[in-house]
C-alpha cells in the first residue's frame, strides 16, 4: 500500500510539473499574467467602480468582449482568472483520473481555458480573422506555431513513448490544437453558408463541423437568421410575400426563430410600398385580392383598404382644392370598385357639372363670429367658432397630407388635432426618405419636434426609426464627415448612429478624412475618435438620448452627453510632447461646457495605447494629422484672432494640470474616508464595508465633516466642491483599496488590521464559494478553506445535500458515488458518517431507468452503483443472466419472464430489463458481489470476534490471512445463499477467458454456415481477405450465404446477377428507412444488422433471406462466443462486432416468430449442396470495388447451371432444402416422383415449445384441407411436419382473409346518402322518397409475408341489392340490403386455391341531428362457409361454417366552406362477433380431423373525413358530384389467436396448435367516388384502397339506384 501511495504521489507531482510547464509555454509572451484588479484599473468603465460592481459589470461581458479588454490592456489572465471569466470549473487532479471519461472531460475544459488565454494575446485575433477571411483551415503545424507551443505527435503513441506523463501532456496539447482548428473551421463554414445564402440541414451541419446535435441546432439558427436578414431587402424589392410553408422550403424550419414576425415585417414593407401605387391610380382592390396578394387575414385587408381609400380621398381633395373665396362645398368624383365599395368622396354624378356659386353657411358664420371680440362671445358662440375652426383645420390637414405628410404632422400638432390625424400622417411618412428631416429638424429650444411627436403618438415606431436612422447614418457619414457645412452636432449624431451598427464605417470614414488635405478640426476629429473607442453601453446611452428615451443607469450617462444627446468622450493627449489645442478641465459641479466637442469626462480617459492597439492604421493617420495641426497652430497663433486659444494648444500642460487636480481630489477623498472611519467603533465588518455602497447615514456624516473649517479650507484651496459626482467617487473604494488605506493609516493597530485582513479574506472566499455552481465543488471548496469559512459552512452545505440530494444532477450523483465519496472521506474522515448518509440518499434517488438510459456509464461503474444501491438486486440480475445465457447455449427460444425472476423491477418494461441484463456480465457481477462481501466481512471482523455464520447456519471459515489460504473461490457465493448447483450452472455458461490459448476452434464447431465461413476467413494468414477488417469479412460471409440461398432455387435465372450486384455492392439501406436514400456500406460506418438491398422484388426476397441468416447466427452459440472473446480482433472492430451480436440477439424473438418454422439448422458435418455454381461467377459478386469492371465478363463466360441443378435434385436425399425450394419442386410437376423425394426438416425444439406458451386470446376453429399425393412417399415424421406447416400457413391465410371480407360492403352502403344541400320548397312533392338499388363489387388483395402469415393474393367479387326509404323533410334514411360475396384465395401452388363464400344481410339507417350533425348505423348478419375439393386422386373434403354479427355506427358533421365545398369529418365505432361451428375432414391418410366450436369478438374505432365538391351540371341535365374520403382505424381488444386441432393420422393421434398473430393496431382507408344523377336515377362509381402492415386491398364499385 505504501509503495502504491509513493508511486501515486510521484505521478501527481510529475504531472503537476508537466502541466505547469505547458501552461507557462502559453504565458511566455510579451504580455504578463495579471489579476483582474490590474485589468480593471486600466478599463475606464471599471476603474471607478467598487469591487462588487466591477465583478457584476465584468460578468455581463461576453467572452469576446472580455478577450478584447485583455488585449487592449496588453495583459494576460492567469489560469484561475480564466476559469472565472469563462465561469467554468476545472479540477487539476481530474487530468490524472483513472476514469477515461473524467480525464477526457478535464482535458476538454483545460483546452478551452488555454485557448481563451491564448485569445487574449496580441495578434491572435488578427491571425484567426485572416484564416476566416481567406476561407483557409490551418494545419496542425501552423496551429502549434500560432499558439506558440511545441507539439510532437509521436509522443502521443504509447508504442513510441513509454512515459505516460509525457503522453498525457502531449495529448493535452493536441486537444488544444484540435479545438483551435475546430473553431476556425466552424467560422469558415458558417461564413461560406452565409455568403452563398444556403441554410444547411441539421445532419449536414453535424457532419460538416463534427459537432453535437444541440450545438448544430444553435449554429444553424445563427446561419439561418443571418441568411434571412440578407435576403429580406431582396424580398421587399421584388414584392414577394412568403407563406410559412414557402419560408420553410426556402430557409428550412427552426423552432427558435419567430418566423411569423419575419413574414409580418416583410408583408408590412411590401404593403406600404404598393399602397402609393393604388393611391396614384385611384384603384381600390377587392378585399379578396388584398388577402390573396399579401396573404393577410380579412381584418388586416380591411384596414389596408381603408388606408388606400383615405389616400385616394386626400388626393381627390387636393385636386379639388379651392381658395377661401370659393364656396365651401367642393365637387369631386367617387370611384367604386368591382365589389361595390364606394371611395367615400361625395357628389359623384358620373358626369362633369358646371361650377356654381352657392351660399357657404360655415364660412359666413365664422366670418360673423370673427368680427366680435372674444370677450363678447357667448359660450355657445365660442364653441361654435371652435368647431368651425376645427373643421377647417381638418380640411387643411387633408390638403397638406397629400403634399407632405411631415408638414401635415406638424400642422396636426400645432392645431391640436386628435391622435388619429397624427397617426394618419405618420403612416404616410416614408421613413427611408424623410429620416434626415425627422432627426435634424429642431425648434427654437433645440428640441426635435418631429421625432418627439412620432414617438409620442406611435411609440411602436421606435425600433423602425432607430433602424432607419442607423441605415441613413451609414450611408451619409462618409460624405458628411468631411463637409464643413455640416454642423458638429449632426456629425456626432451620425457617428453615434453608425457606430452602434458598424464601427468599421466610422473607422473608414475617419481614415479617409484624415488622409486627405480637406477641412478638418482637431476637437472634431478627437470627439469622433472617442465615439469610435466607446463601448456598447455608452453608445446605447447616446442612442437613447438622441431619441429622448429613458436612459439606463449607466456609468456617467449624464455627464457624457452633448447638447444633442450624443455621447462625448475626451480628446486624445498629444503624441509628440507638443501643445495642440486642448479642452478645459472638467467642472466638478457637473455643469457641461457650451461646445459640443469640448466636454470632458474624467472617468472615460482617451487611452492612446488602446487606440493604437485597436485601430493601428487610423492611429497612424491621426498621428500625422496631430503633427500637421500642431505646426499650423504654432505658425498661425499670432496672425489671426480666430486661432485656437493657447490653453488648448498646450495639451500637455493641460493634461498635467488635470492629473494634479485628480491627484488632489484623491487625497481629499482619502482624507474624508479616514475622518468618517474615525467616527465608528472598530469592527472589521463595519470598516471593510463602509464605502462599498452609498447610504444616507454616511452621506450625512460626509456633509458634517465637509462643514468643518479645516476641511473647508482644504476644499477651497484645491477648488473642490461636494457634488453628487464627487460623492459617488467616495463610495467607489474597492476591497484592496480599503485594506491599503487602513494599513497605511494610524486609525488601527497591527492586531486590528490582521482581523480586518481575515475578514476581507473571508469575504473573498464567500464570494468565490457562491460563484461555484456545482454543489459538490462547493463542498470541496468549503473543506479546503474551512479555516476561513468555518466548520458551519461545510456542515450546512453537507446537511443541505443530505436533505435534498436532487440538487445534484444525475452525472454529479454518479460521480459522487463512484469517486467523490472516496475522496471526501479520505480528506475529511470526521465527516464520514454524514457522507455515508449523503451517499445512501443519493443512491435512493438514482433511478434504475436512468442507469439503463445512460449509455455512457461503463459496465464496471454500473455494477458498482447497483452493488452499492441494492446487492440483492444484483443477485437477481445474476440469476436472470445465467438463465438467458443457458438459453443461448442450448439454442432455446423459450421466452423468459424476467419480471418473475426480478419482481423488484416489475415496474420496468421488458425492453428495459433486457437492456440492463445485456449490459452486465457474469464475471463482473461475481467480482462486484465478492468485493461487497469482503467489505462486509472486514467490517464484521473488525467489530466483533464472534465466528461468522453462513445464511444456512453453518459456521463461516476465518478470514484469509494475506490472501494465502485454502478458502474456496466460490464460498462467498454460498454464504450469500447460492447453491452449488447454481454455481456449476454459472461455470458452464461462463465465457472462455483463455480464448485463442487453451481453446482451439474448428469449422465444424459452428452451427451456421456464416459462422463457419467467418471463422475460416479470420483464421487465414494470407490471401486477399487479409486486407479486409473483421466486420467486412463477416459482411461478405453473410452476403455469400444469402446469395447461395437465392441461387439454389432451381427456377432462378442467373440473369439476376446485375440486380444482386446492385443489392449487395452498390446500395445499402436501413430497414427503418424504406425510401431510396443512399447511405454508406455498413463496413464503412457501423455493422448494423438491419441493412438490406433495394426495396425491389429481388431486394425484398434478399432481405427475407438475410433475416433468416441472422436467425441462424443468433442460434449459433459457438459463433457468438467466438466473436465476443476473440482477443485477436482490434478493439474498435471488436466493439463493432459485439454491438452487431447484441442487436441480432435482441431481434431473435421477432425473427423466431417470423421465420422459426422455415429456418432449419444447418449440418456442418456435410457439404451443403447449392448446385454446381461456377465459382468465378460466385466470387465476382464480392470482389472489391476496384475489380468491379471484370465482373460482367467473368459472369458472361460461365454456362448456366441448369444441368448441375438437375444433378443436385437427384443427389443425397438427406440434404436439407428450404421450404421455398420444396414448394417450387412440388409445383413444378405434381406427378414427378423425383420431386416427391424432397424432404422437409422437422421444426426445431424452439418452435415446438412456442406452442405451449399461454396466449391471451380465445381459440378459433378453422377448416383445413390437405393435399396428400405430394407426401405419399415420405416417412411419417416428415409427413407430420408437412401437415403442421401446411396447417399453419393455410389457417393464417383464411383467418386474415375472412376478417376483411365484409369491410368494403359496410363502407359503401351509405357512402352516397349524406345530403350536402337542402331541397328547395318547390321540390317537396312527397314526404317519403323510396328507391331500390343494386351494386357490383370487384377487388384484388395482396398480403406480404408478415410474422407467420405467408404471402397470398386474393380476388373479391360480390353483388348487393337493397331498398330504402328517405324522409324528405328530415333527410332520414332507413333501408335493408343483401350481399352475396366470394373471395378467391391463391397462395402457393402446393396448397391450391380456396374459395370463401359469404351471405350478408344488413339493416342500415341515417338520422339527421341538429346543427349539421348526422348519425348513421349498420347492423349486419353474415354467414360464411368454405368447401374445398382438390383435383388430385385422393380427395380431401373440408367443410367450415362461420356466423358473424356486426354493428357499426358513424357520427358525421357537415361543414360548408366557400365555393360550395363541403367538409364532413366523422368518428365511428364498430363491434364484431363471430362464432365458428364444429367440422371434420376425411381422406385417405388423415382419417379424422376435428376442431371445436369457438367464438371471437373484436372492437374497432375510426376517425376520418369526406370532402364533397360542388356539383357540376353537364349536358342532358346530368349532375356530377365528385368526392374524396379517408379514415384511420384503430383495433382494440387485439389479441393473438390459437387454433387447436386434433387429428387421427395413420392410426396416431396428432395435436396441432396454430398461432394466429393479432391484427396490426392501425389500418388506413382512402377512396374517391363520383355520383351521376339525372331525374330519379343515380349512378355511383367508386374506388377504395385499404392497407395495413404488409396488406393492400383495391376495390372498385358501381352502384345503380332508381327512386320510385
Curated annotation (Swiss-Prot):
Residues 1325-1604 form the Autotransporter domain. Residues 324-354, 554-603, 1183-1240 are annotated as: Disordered. Residues 1193-1213, 1227-1240 have a biased composition (Basic and acidic residues). Gene3D superfamilies: Autotransporter beta-domain. It comes from Rickettsia felis (strain ATCC VR-1525 / URRWXCal2) (Rickettsia azadi). This is Putative surface cell antigen sca2. NCBIfam families: autotrans_barl. Residues 568-587 have a biased composition (Pro residues). It is found in: Cell outer membrane. One of its GO terms (cellular component) is cell outer membrane. SMART domains: Autotransporter (SM00869). Coiled coil: none annotated. InterPro entries: Autotransporte_beta, Autotransporte_beta_dom_sf, OM_autotransptr_brl_dom, Sca2. Residues 1-33 form the signal peptide. It comes from the Bacteria. It holds the Pfam family Autotransporter. Residues 554-564 have a biased composition (Low complexity). The gene is sca2. Keywords: Cell outer membrane, Membrane, Signal, Transmembrane, Transmembrane beta strand. PROSITE patterns: AUTOTRANSPORTER.
Amino acid at each position: 500500500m505504501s509503495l502504491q501511495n509513493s508511486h501515486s504521489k510521484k505521478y501527481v507531482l510529475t504531472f503537476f510539473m508537466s502541466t505547469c510547464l505547458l501552461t507557462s509555454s502559453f504565458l511566455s509572451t510579451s504580455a504578463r499574467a495579471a489579476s483582474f484588479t490590474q485589468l480593471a484599473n486600466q478599463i475606464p468603465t471599471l476603474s471607478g467602480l467598487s469591487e462588487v460592481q466591477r465583478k457584476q459589470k465584468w460578468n455581463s461581458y461576453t467572452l469576446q468582449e472580455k478577450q478584447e479588454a485583455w488585449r487592449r490592456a496588453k495583459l494576460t489572465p492567469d489560469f484561475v482568472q480564466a476559469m472565472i471569466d469563462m465561469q467554468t470549473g476545472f479540477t487539476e487532479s481530474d487530468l490524472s483520473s483513472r476514469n477515461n471519461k473524467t480525464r477526457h472531460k478535464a482535458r476538454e475544459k483545460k483546452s478551452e481555458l488555454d485557448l481563451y488565454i491564448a485569445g487574449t494575446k496580441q495578434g491572435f485575433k488578427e491571425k484567426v480573422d485572416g484564416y476566416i477571411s481567406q476561407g483557409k483551415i490551418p494545419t496542425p503545424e501552423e496551429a502549434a506555431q500560432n499558439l506558440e507551443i511545441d507539439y510532437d505527435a509521436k509522443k502521443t503513441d504509447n508504442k513510441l513513448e513509454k512515459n505516460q506523463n509525457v503522453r498525457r501532456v502531449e495529448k493535452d496539447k493536441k486537444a488544444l490544437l484540435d479545438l483551435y482548428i475546430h473553431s476556425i473551421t466552424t467560422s469558415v463554414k458558417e461564413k461560406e453558408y452565409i455568403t452563398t445564402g444556403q441554410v444547411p440541414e441539421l445532419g449536414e451541419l453535424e457532419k460538416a463541423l463534427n459537432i453535437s446535435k444541440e450545438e448544430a441546432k444553435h449554429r444553424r439558427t445563427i446561419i439561418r437568421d443571418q441568411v434571412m436578414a440578407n435576403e429580406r431587402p431582396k424580398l421587399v424589392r421584388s414584392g414577394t410575400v412568403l407563406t410559412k410553408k414557402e419560408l420553410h422550403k426556402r430557409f428550412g424550419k427552426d423552432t427558435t426563430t419567430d418566423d411569423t414576425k419575419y413574414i409580418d415585417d416583410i408583408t408590412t414593407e411590401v404593403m406600404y410600398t404598393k399602397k402609393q401605387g393604388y393611391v396614384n391610380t385611384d384603384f381600390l382592390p377587392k378585399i379578396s385580392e388584398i388577402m390573396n396578394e399579401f396573404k393577410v387575414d380579412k381584418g388586416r385587408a380591411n384596414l389596408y383598404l381603408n388606408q388606400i381609400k383615405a389616400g385616394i380621398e386626400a388626393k381627390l381633395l387636393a385636386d379639388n382644392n379651392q381658395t377661401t373665396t370659393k364656396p365651401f362645398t367642393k365637387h369631386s368624383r367617387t370611384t367604386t370598385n368591382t365589389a361595390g365599395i364606394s371611395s367615400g368622396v361625395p357628389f359623384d354624378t358620373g358626369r362633369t357639372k358646371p361650377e356654381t356659386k352657392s351660399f357657404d353657411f360655415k364660412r359666413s358664420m365664422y366670418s360673423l363670429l370673427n368680427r366680435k371680440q372674444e370677450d363678447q362671445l357667448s359660450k355657445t358662440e365660442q364653441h361654435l367658432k371652435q368647431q368651425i375652426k376645427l373643421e377647417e383645420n381638418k380640411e387643411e390637414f387633408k390638403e397638406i397630407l397629400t403634399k407632405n405628410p411631415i408638414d401635415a404632422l406638424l400642422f396636426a400638432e400645432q392645431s391640436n388635432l386628435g391622435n388619429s390625424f397624427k397617426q394618419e400622417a405618420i403612416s404616410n411618412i416614408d421613413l427611408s426618405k424623410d429620416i434626415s428631416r425627422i432627426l435634424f429638424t429642431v425648434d427654437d429650444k433645440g428640441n426635435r419636434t418631429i421625432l418627439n411627436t412620432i414617438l409620442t403618438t406611435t411609440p411602436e415606431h421606435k425600433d423602425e426609426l432607430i433602424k432607419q436612422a442607423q441605415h441613413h447614418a451609414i450611408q451619409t457619414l462618409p460624405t458628411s464627415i468631411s463637409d464643413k457645412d455640416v454642423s458638429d452636432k449632426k456629425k456626432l449624431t451620425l457617428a453615434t448612429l453608425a457606430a452602434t451598427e458598424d464601427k468599421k464605417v466610422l473607422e473608414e470614414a475617419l481614415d479617409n478624412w484624415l488622409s486627405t488635405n480637406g477641412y478638418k478640426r482637431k476637437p472634431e476629429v478627437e470627439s469622433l475618435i472617442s465615439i469610435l473607442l466607446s463601448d456598447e453601453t455608452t453608445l446605447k446611452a447616446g442612442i437613447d438620448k438622441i431619441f429622448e428615451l429613458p436612459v439606463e443607469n449607466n456609468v456617467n450617462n449624464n455627464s457624457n452627453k452633448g447638447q444633442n444627446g450624443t455621447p462625448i468622450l475626451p480628446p486624445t493627449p498629444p503624441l509628440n510632447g507638443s501643445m495642440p489645442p486642448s479642452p478645459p478641465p472638467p467642472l466638478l459641479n457637473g455643469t457641461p461646457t457650451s461646445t459640443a466637442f469640448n466636454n470632458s469626462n474624467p472617468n472615460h480617459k482617451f487611452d492612446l495605447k488602446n487606440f493604437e492597439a485597436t485601430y493601428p492604421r487610423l492611429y497612424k493617420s491621426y498621428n500625422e494629422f496631430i503633427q500637421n495641426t500642431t505646426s499650423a497652430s504654432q505658425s498661425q497663433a499670432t496672425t489671426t484672432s480666430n486661432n485656437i486659444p493657447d490653453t488648448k494648444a498646450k495639451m500637455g500642460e493641460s493634461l498635467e494640470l488635470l492629473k494634479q487636480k485628480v491627484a488632489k481630489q484623491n487625497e481629499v477623498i482619502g482624507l474624508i474616508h479616514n475622518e468618517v472611519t474615525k467616527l465608528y467603533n472598530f469592527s472589521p465588518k463595519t470598516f471593510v464595508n463602509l464605502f462599498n455602497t452609498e447610504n444616507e447615514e454616511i452621506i450625512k456624516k460626509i456633509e458634517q465633516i465637509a462643514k468643518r473649517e479645516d476641511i473647508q479650507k482644504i476644499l477651497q484651496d484645491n477648488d473642490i466642491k461636494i457634488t453628487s459626482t464627487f460623492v459617488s467617487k467616495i463610495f467607489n473604494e474597492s476591497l484592496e483599496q480599503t485594506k491599503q488605506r487602513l494599513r497605511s493609516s494610524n486609525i488601527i493597530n497591527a492586531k486590528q488590521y490582521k482581523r480586518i485582513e481575515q475578514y476581507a479574506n473571508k469575504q473573498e472566499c464567500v464570494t468565490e464559494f457562491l460563484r461555484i455552481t456545482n454543489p459538490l465543488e462547493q463542498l470541496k471548496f468549503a473543506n479546503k478553506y474551512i479555516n476561513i469559512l468555518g466548520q458551519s459552512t461545510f456542515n450546512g452545505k453537507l446537511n443541505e445535500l443530505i436533505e435534498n440530494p436532487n440538487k445534484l444532477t444525475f452525472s454529479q450523483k454518479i460521480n459522487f458515488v463512484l469517486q467523490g465519496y472516496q475522496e471526501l472521506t479520505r480528506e475529511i474522515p470526521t465527516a464520514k458518517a454524514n457522507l455515508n448518509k449523503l451517499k445512501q440518499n443519493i443512491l435512493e434517488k438514482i433511478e434504475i431507468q436512468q442507469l439503463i438510459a445512460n449509455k455512457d456509464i461503463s459496465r464496471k461503474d454500473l455494477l458498482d452503483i447497483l452493488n452499492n444501491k441494492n446487492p440483492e438486486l444484483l443477485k437477481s440480475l445474476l440469476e436472470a443472466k445465467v438463465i438467458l445465457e443457458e438459453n443461448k447455449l442450448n439454442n432455446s427460444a423459450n421466452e423468459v419472464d424476467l419480471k418473475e425472476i426480478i419482481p423488484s423491477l416489475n415496474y420496468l418494461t421488458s425492453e428495459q430489463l433486457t437492456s440492463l441484463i445485456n449490459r452486465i456480465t457474469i464475471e463482473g457481477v461475481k467480482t462486484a458481489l465478492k468485493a461487497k462481501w469482503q467489505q462486509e466481512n472486514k467490517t464484521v471482523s473488525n467489530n466483533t470476534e464472534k465466528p461468522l455464520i453462513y445464511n444456512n447456519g453453518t459456521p463461516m471459515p476465518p478470514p484469509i490471512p494475506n490472501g494465502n489460504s485454502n478458502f474456496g473461490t466460490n464460498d462467498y457465493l454460498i454464504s450469500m445463499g447460492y447453491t452449488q448447483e447454481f454455481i456449476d450452472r454459472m461455470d458452464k455458461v461462463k465465457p472462455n477467458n483463455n480464448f485463442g490459448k487453451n481453446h482451439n476452434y474448428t469449422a465444424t464447431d459452428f452451427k451456421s454456415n456464416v459462422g463457419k465461413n467467418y471463422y475460416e476467413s479470420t483464421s487465414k494468414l494470407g490471401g486477399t481477405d487479409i486486407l479486409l477488417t473483421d466486420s467486412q469479412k463477416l459482411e461478405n460471409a453473410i452476403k455469400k450465404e444469402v446469395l447461395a440461398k437465392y441461387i439454389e432455387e432451381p427456377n432462378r435465372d442467373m440473369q439476376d446477377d446485375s440486380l444482386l450486384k446492385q443489392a449487395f455492392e452498390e446500395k445499402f439501406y436501413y430497414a427503418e428507412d424504406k425510401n431510396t436514400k443512399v447511405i454508406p456500406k455498413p463496413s464503412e460506418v457501423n455493422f448494423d444488422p438491419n441493412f438490406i438491398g433495394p426495396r425491389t422484388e429481388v431486394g425484398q426476397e434478399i432481405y427475407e433471406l438475410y433475416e433468416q441468416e441472422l436467425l441462424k447466427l443468433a442460434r449459433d452459440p459457438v459463433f457468438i462466443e467466438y466473436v465476443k472473446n476473440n482477443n485477436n480482433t482490434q478493439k474498435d472492430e471488436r466493439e463493432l462486432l459485439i454491438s452487431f451480436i447484441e442487436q441480432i440477439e435482441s431481434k431473435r424473438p421477432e425473427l423466431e416468430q417470423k421465420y422459426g418454422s422455415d429456418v432449419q439448422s444447418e449440418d456442418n458435418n456435410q457439404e451443403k449442396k447449392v448446385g454446381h455454381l461456377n465459382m468465378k461467377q460466385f466470387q465476382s459478386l464480392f470482389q472489391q470495388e476496384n475489380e468491379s469492371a471484370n465482373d460482367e465478363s467473368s459472369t458472361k463466360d460461365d454456362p448456366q447451371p441448369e444441368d448441375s441443378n438437375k444433378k443436385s435434385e437427384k443427389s443425397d436425399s438427406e440434404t436439407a432444402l428450404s421450404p421455398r425450394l420444396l414448394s417450387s419442386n412440388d409445383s413444378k410437376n405434381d406427378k414427378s416422383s423425383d420431386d416427391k423425394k424432397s424432404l422437409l426438416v422437422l421444426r426445431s425444439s424452439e418452435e415446438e415449445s412456442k406452442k405451449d406458451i399461454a396466449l391471451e386470446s380465445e381459440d378459433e376453429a378453422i377448416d383445413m384441407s390437405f393435399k396428400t399425393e405430394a407426401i405419399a412417399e415420405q416417412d411419417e415424421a416428415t409427413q407430420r411436419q408437412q401437415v403442421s406447416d401446411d396447417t399453419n400457413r393455410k389457417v393464417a391465410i383464411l383467418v386474415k382473409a375472412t376478417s376483411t371480407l365484409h369491410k368494403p360492403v359496410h363502407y359503401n352502403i351509405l357512402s352516397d346518402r349524406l345530403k350536402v344541400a337542402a331541397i328547395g320548397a318547390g321540390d317537396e312533392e312527397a314526404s317519403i322518397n323510396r328507391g331500390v338499388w343494386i351494386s357490383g363489387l370487384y377487388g384484388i388483395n395482396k398480403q406480404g409475408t408478415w410474422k407467420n402469415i405467408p404471402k397470398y393474393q386474393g380476388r373479391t367479387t360480390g353483388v348487393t341489392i337493397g331498398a330504402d326509404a328517405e324522409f324528405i323533410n328530415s333527410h332520414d334514411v332507413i333501408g335493408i340490403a343483401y350481399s352475396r360475396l366470394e373471395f378467391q384465395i391463391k397462395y402457393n401452388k402446393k396448397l391450391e386455391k380456396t374459395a370463401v363464400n359469404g351471405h350478408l344481410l344488413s339493416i342500415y339507417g341515417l338520422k339527421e341531428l341538429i346543427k349539421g350533425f348526422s348519425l348513421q348505423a349498420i347492423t349486419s348478419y353474415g354467414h360464411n362457409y368454405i368447401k374445398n375439393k382438390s383435383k388430385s386422386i385422393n380427395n380431401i373434403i373440408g367443410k367450415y361454417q362461420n356466423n358473424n354479427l356486426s354493428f357499426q355506427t358513424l357520427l358525421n358533421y357537415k361543414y360548408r366552406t366557400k365555393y360550395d365545398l363541403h367538409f364532413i369529418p366523422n368518428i365511428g365505432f364498430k363491434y364484431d362477433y363471430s362464432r365458428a361451428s364444429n367440422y371434420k375432414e376425411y381422406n385417405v391418410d388423415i382419417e379424422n380431423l376435428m376442431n371445436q366450436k369457438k367464438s371471437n369478438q373484436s372492437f374497432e374505432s375510426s376517425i376520418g373525413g369526406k370532402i364533397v365538391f360542388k356539383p357540376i351540371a353537364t349536358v342532358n341535365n346530368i349532375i356530377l358530384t365528385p368526392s374524396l374520403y379517408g379514415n384511420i382505424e384503430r383495433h382494440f381488444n387485439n389479441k393473438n389467436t390459437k387454433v387447436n386441432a386434433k387429428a387421427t393420422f395413420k392410426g396416431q393421434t396428432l395435436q396441432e396448435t396454430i398461432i394466429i398473430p393479432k391484427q396490426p393496431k392501425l389500418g388506413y382507408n382512402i377512396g374517391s367516388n363520383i355520383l351521376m344523377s339525372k331525374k330519379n336515377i343515380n349512378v355511383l362509381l367508386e374506388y377504395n384502397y385499404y392497407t395495413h402492415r404488409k396488406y393492400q386491398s383495391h376495390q372498385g364499385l358501381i352502384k345503380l339506384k332508381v327512386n320510385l
